[in-house]
């Protein structure tokens, strides 16, 4: 049974809240929040444990003074992975931790997204949340534990937040005892491998009314979801497919655990009893400024928001904003100052724009570009654009334009991950680039920002379940998505471009995948709450909506989902209908993609040809040779790259089939030898000259001797070197093989 217990050590000032999570047949997990022992000078510090081995220190600290001139809340979240957490020394040159790993950056985003909306609006003091990973079990992922730790530290910090955030990872596990699947909270790495689908869900507690009664409920704030790598095979075996219904069921299954974790944090905060501090708040604009802007701009702005083209609409609305500012600034600059008055007028103008668009969507089903609520923008699909790339594609959806590029290489080129994540290698790598010109702007170009890493991870998660196994396709795969134009969901465009590019590169995907971005707008209309789901949202609709979610999948099931909402809860039917609307769009996009390419093309002439052979494990050392002598010689002679796995699998990569065949022949001769027979002829190489004859190499590791008496073609030879030299090619025939395997050779005399 899931429950919360509290312990207090008054001697040391340590307070604990322990949440026990009951997974039924799959056992229990314990989340423990502890405060009072570590990092006492931080505004809030909580040590969070998952069972006994995973331990994180979460701290929240706020600056004393607000940052001047900011029009946003300066919250930063940092995850510090300490390699001592896994009993390892960092592999870097200086043997200390450097820049954060991809996994740490993704954990930062996972924490920031549900935590940021809980802060009071108008806060301008810098707030820094730092999670230090101090110990981690190889069986556990720390990211979801960090969501709870960061929330608990913030909740007891005295900062103005609306409440605690609870986060949980849910895995749908189907086995012989649970053929329909059971949702398991905080699954171990072993349970994750056995799962069909995973959800990371974060939410908070809200008060609801039903009649005269008030009760507490969980409002979902964020969802990250993905299918397992072997989901296609699991479905064939009878496991449930992760459909839209599965997602809805998983969200409901997560709510009791989120409720438990939030109650544990709230109980901890009550026992710490730190008062909420007073902070100056800076609302974006005053009511007077908004009223003036609304009166001045409402009518014309409503007309401008019907301009379909993004650039034309933005230019027109920006010009009109300058006009409105010039007319109104004189009214407010004496009281506010010119700079503040300008900022408030512009903020009020943007807020009015949002109100106009939302109102027309809810009352008329109006969209900025004239589409219906479920319409997809015009699609453009093309493959094979880049001459020397192994695979390439261009996917366009309205003004969003994504170039997908695929590169194939040997498995030794897969990414080796030096982080605290349970996974240590990555064979399929998806990298996403978002240059400033994609939105018609200038900006910094260089190492990827957190947003780019997050979008790449989402697209990677969407495509990974359909990537063929390393046995079926022994290649490392790097997929790059270049966002060349952006006006709504470049991440889902990247998923579509990836499918096209991978097919063009000859990758035999288990199924094609497409993605779509959805939005939801909600408000009171005539006393009733109305919800409108929008398919294929524009950038402006993303900013103006109450919820956005991105769904990727095949025609049969969902492979990835990401959801963020500002609402205090979404009715189950509204979410189910929105997911079904997304499925219809996904099927339409898949159909358009299939008209251009619906299966793997022939591999590019520039892509390496990789073949595999199996050798006995006992022969691995012999194939490598002393200090790599044999394998280096094979590489040099054939021009092929050779990689050997611990189980005796040998991967051979070559630019041509001839080079690969030559390498296979030589490897088999060495590691899978067949004894030569008497009478067989070879074109061998003289490798050694002695006083009694010449040794000739027939096969790698297999030499024979031509006696000096056989070298002269019937004539007496005084010195072997008078007839042959080391390195010379010599046609020989096996004359005899003795019982010790020693081979006697005779030169082959060409007949006239």
From Swiss-Prot:
One of its GO terms (molecular function) is magnesium ion binding. GO terms for biological process: mRNA catabolic process; RNA processing. It is found in: Cytoplasm. It comes from the Bacteria. It catalyses: RNA(n+1) + phosphate = RNA(n) + a ribonucleoside 5'-diphosphate. Its main location: cytoplasm. Its EC number is 2.7.7.8. Its cofactor is Mg(2+). Belongs to the polyribonucleotide nucleotidyltransferase family. Involved in mRNA degradation. Catalyzes the phosphorolysis of single-stranded polyribonucleotides processively in the 3'- to 5'-direction. This is Polyribonucleotide nucleotidyltransferase.
């Amino acid at each position: 049974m899931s429950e919360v217990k509290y312990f207090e050590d008054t001697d040391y000032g340590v307070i604990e809240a322990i949440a026990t999570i009951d997974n039924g047949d799959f056992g229990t997990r314990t989340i423990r929040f502890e405060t009072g022992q570590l990092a006492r000078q931080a505004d809030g510090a909580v040590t969070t444990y998952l069972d006994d081995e995973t331990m994180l220190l979460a701290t929240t600290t706020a600056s004393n003074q607000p940052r001047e001139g900011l029009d946003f809340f300066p919250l930063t979240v940092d995850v510090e992975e300490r390699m001592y957490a896994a009993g390892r020394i960092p592999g870097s040159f200086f043997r200390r931790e450097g820049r954060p790993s991809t996994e740490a950056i993704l954990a930062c985003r996972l924490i920031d997204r549900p935590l940021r909306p809980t802060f009071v609006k108008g806060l301008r003091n810098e707030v820094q949340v730092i999670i230090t990973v101090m110990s981690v079990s190889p069986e556990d992922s720390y990211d979801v534990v960090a969501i709870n730790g960061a929330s608990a530290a913030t909740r007891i910090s005295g900062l103005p937040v609306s409440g605690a955030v609870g986060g949980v990872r849910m895995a749908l596990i189907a086995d012989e005892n649970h053929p329909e699947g059971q949702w398991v909270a905080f699954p171990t790495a072993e349970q994750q491998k056995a799962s069909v689908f995973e959800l990371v869900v974060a939410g908070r507690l809200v008060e609801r009314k039903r009649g005269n009664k008030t009760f507490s409920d969980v409002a979902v704030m964020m969802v990250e979801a993905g299918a397992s790598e072997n989901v296609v095979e699991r479905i064939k075996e009878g496991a449930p497919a992760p459909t839209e219904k599965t997602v809805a069921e998983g969200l409901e299954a997560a709510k009791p655990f989120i409720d438990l974790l939030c109650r544990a944090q709230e109980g901890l905060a009550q026992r710490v009893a730190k008062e909420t501090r007073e902070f100056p708040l800076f609302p974006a604009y005053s009511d007077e400024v908004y009223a003036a802007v609304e009166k001045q701009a409402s009518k014309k702005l409503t007309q401008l928001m019907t301009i379909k083209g993004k650039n034309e609409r933005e230019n027109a609305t920006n010009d009109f904003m300058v006009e409105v500012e010039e007319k109104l600034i004189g009214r407010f600059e004496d009281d506010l100052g010119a700079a503040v008055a300008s900022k408030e007028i512009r903020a009020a103008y943007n807020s009015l724009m949002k109100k106009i668009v939302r109102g027309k969507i809810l009352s008329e089903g109006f969209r900025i570009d004239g589409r219906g609520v479920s319409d997809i923008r015009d699609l453009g699909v093309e493959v094979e654009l880049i001459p020397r790339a192994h695979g390439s594609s261009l996917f366009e959806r309205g003004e969003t334009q994504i170039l997908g590029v695929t590169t194939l290489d040997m498995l030794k080129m897969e990414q080796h991950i030096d982080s605290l994540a349970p996974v240590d290698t990555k064979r399929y790598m998806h990298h996403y680039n978002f240059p400033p010109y994609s939105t018609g702007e200038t900006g910094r170009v260089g190492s990827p920002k957190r947003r780019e890493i997050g979008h790449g991870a989402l697209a990677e998660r969407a495509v990974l379940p359909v990537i063929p196994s390393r046995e079926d396709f022994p290649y490392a795969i790097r997929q790059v998505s270049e966002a060349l134009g952006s006006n709504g969901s470049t991440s889902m465009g990247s998923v579509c471009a990836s499918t096209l590019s991978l097919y063009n590169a000859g990758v035999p995907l288990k199924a094609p995948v497409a993605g779509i971005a959805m939005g939801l707008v909600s408000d009171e209309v005539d006393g009733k709450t109305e919800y409108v789901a929008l398919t294929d949202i524009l950038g402006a609709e993303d900013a103006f909506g109450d919820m956005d979610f991105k769904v990727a999948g095949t025609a049969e099931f969902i492979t990835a989902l990401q959801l963020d909402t500002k609402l205090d809860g979404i009715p189950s039917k509204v979410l189910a209908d929105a997911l079904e609307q997304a499925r219809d769009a996904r099927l339409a996009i898949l159909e358009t993609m299939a008209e251009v390419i619906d299966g793997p093309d022939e591999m590019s002439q520039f892509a390496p040809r990789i073949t595999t052979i199996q050798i006995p494990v006992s022969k691995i050392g012999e194939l490598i040779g002393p200090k790599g002598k044999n394998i280096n010689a094979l590489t040099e002679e054939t021009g092929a790259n050779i990689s050997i796995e611990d189980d005796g699998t040998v991967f051979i990569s070559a630019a041509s089939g001839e080079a690969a065949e030559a390498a296979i022949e030589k490897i088999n001769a060495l590691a899978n030898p067949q004894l030569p027979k008497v009478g067989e002829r070879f074109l061998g190489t003289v490798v050694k000259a002695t006083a009694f004859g010449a040794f000739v190499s027939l096969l790698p590791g297999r030499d024979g001797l031509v006696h000096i008496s056989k070298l002269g073609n019937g004539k007496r030879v005084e010195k072997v070197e008078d007839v042959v030299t080391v390195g010379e090619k010599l046609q020989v025939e096996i004359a005899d093989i003795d019982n010790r395997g020693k081979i006697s050779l005779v030169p082959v005399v060409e007949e006239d």
